[in-house]
Structures are given as structure tokens and as C-alpha cells.
Amino acid sequence: MTNAPLTSTPVPATTKPISNGTDAPLFSSQLISPEVLAALPPGYTIRPLRRSDFQRGYLDVLRVLTTVGEVSDEQWNQRYDWISSRNDEYYLLVVCDEAERIVGTGSLIVERKFIHSLGLVGHIEDIAVEKGQQGKKLGLRIIQALDFVASNVGCYKVYPFALKLILSRQWLTVCV
């Protein structure tokens, strides 16, 4: 995955819009890979999460991956505001179909380290694709897009989602 220089500097917060109650994206769409956009099936797009994605099925897509629970509009807005306030740590992407319905998602969480000259490490998490949309390489495109974001915000290393799954299974095998 990403092999950015060891002297990583976080992207200034001004490159990521804060929603302030509007439907602005969670971060700048300039961080979306043009190559990934071009590789999506016709009619699909990938973009940063927006506040209005609650109504577009964001949580329903996450339910393919894990338990989400019942989340009210108010709870969604509180969590969205909290994530948005950490404007150089959280990068959540969604894939939308022609109807602007969310069919896939993934997250990049940026961790600050003391090592590697106060470097940044990216963690790709929560890759989920709606069951009826699987088989279109949308999960792969989400991972590629998040890796591109990680590289562009200065991460010297990225831990991919799939590797975590493999390692956790191997770890369980060793521990049993």
C-alpha cells in the first residue's frame, strides 16, 4: 500500500470542509482518486460522506458488515459533527449508484505516531458493500480510494482492512 515519505505532515484542516449544519462533504473531494472514479462501473460515483447520507442508506450498508443498532437523526447528527470536528483524522467514503443511493462505504482513520518523525499511519476500516452490489469490485475501489487519500494526507504506512481480517484469523488459530 502507501509508502509516503517518513517525514509526514498532516494536511491542514482547511483542506477539509466542516459542515456546520449544511450538507457539505466530510472532506475535500480533491482527495478522491481520478483513477478510481474512472474505474467504477458506469453510473456509479465515489465521494466523501455527507450529513444527508443518513437518508441515503449509509447505515443499511454498514449492516452488511456488522451490528449497527438503532440510530436516530439526532444521534446521527451528533456523531457526524464529532467526526467532522476531527477533520484530519476521519475520512469516510461512500459509493453511490445512479439514484444517489449508497451501495458501499469505507473509512480511513489517521493515527498520529511518535516514531518516523511524528509520522502518520492510516487504518482502513469498515469496508462494506450492499449484498446486491457485490461482485462489481466496489470494495476494491473503496480500498484503492482510501489508500489514495492516505497517501495524499501524508500517511507513511496504511494497514488495509483485509489484512486485519487475515491476521485476526491467524492470531485466533495460534491462540487456540
Give the location of each predicted region.
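Conserved beta-strand in the GNAT
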Residues: V94, R101-V110, A128
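Glycine-rich phosphate/pyrophosphate-binding loop shared by adenosine-nucleotide-utilizing enzymes
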Residues: Y44, A99-T105, G122
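Conserved active-site alpha-helix within GNAT-family acetyltransferase domains
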Residues: L140, F148-V158, L163-V176
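Helix-loop element at the rim of GNAT/NAT acetyltransferase active sites that forms part
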Residues: S52, D60-D73, F114
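A conserved beta-turn-beta hairpin within the catalytic core of GNAT-like acetyltransferases
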Residues: R101, R112-I124, Q134
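Conserved acetyl-CoA-binding loop-helix of GNAT-fold acetyltransferases
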Residues: D126-V129, G135-F148
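Conserved N-terminal entry element of GNAT/NAT acetyltransferase domains
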Residues: M1-S52
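A short helix-loop-beta-strand connector motif used in the catalytic cores of GNAT acetyltransferases and
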Residues: D81-V94, H123
